[in-house]
Curated annotation (Swiss-Prot):
In muscle, parvalbumin is thought to be involved in relaxation after contraction. It binds two calcium ions. This is Parvalbumin alpha. Ca(2+) 2 binds at residues 91, 93, 95, 97, 102. Residues 39-74, 78-110 form the EF-hand domain. The gene is PVALB. Belongs to the parvalbumin family. AB domain, comprising of helices A and B, is involved in structural stabilization, protecting the hydrophobic core of the protein. It is required for high-affinity binding of Ca(2+) and for Mg(2+)-binding. Disulfide bonds: none annotated. Ca(2+) 1 binds at residues 52, 54, 56, 58, 60, 63. It comes from the Eukaryota. The modification Phosphoserine is found at residues 2, 24. InterPro entries: EF-hand-dom_pair (IPR011992), EF_Hand_1_Ca_BS (IPR018247), EF_hand_dom (IPR002048), Parvalbumin (IPR008080).
Amino acid sequence: MSMTDLLHAEDIKKAVGAFTAVDSFDHKKFFQMVGLKKKSPEDVKKVFHILDKDKSGFIEEEELGFILKGFSPDARDLSVKETKTLLAAGDKDGDGKIGADEFSTLVAES
């Protein structure tokens, strides 16, 4: 399954394009722009599993740095600051990674 099976390619392109500048990433705006906020909980979990590159059941800090690439392969990497901000927003239990339920909450709060 690919991201475009769940989200519109044009929405992905616009959302990724809106955050090309370093340190401009805002996960709340991004999730809204890409259309993820409007998706069912099941679809949000499918997106989570696409972003969980090592299939560990979590999106670790290293994977978060590549989150935009999960939506569009030619997108930029997040900066260290952006990655840490995203991790802090999503890691509700403080274990240093984001699980599927935490990701769903992060999207719902966007």
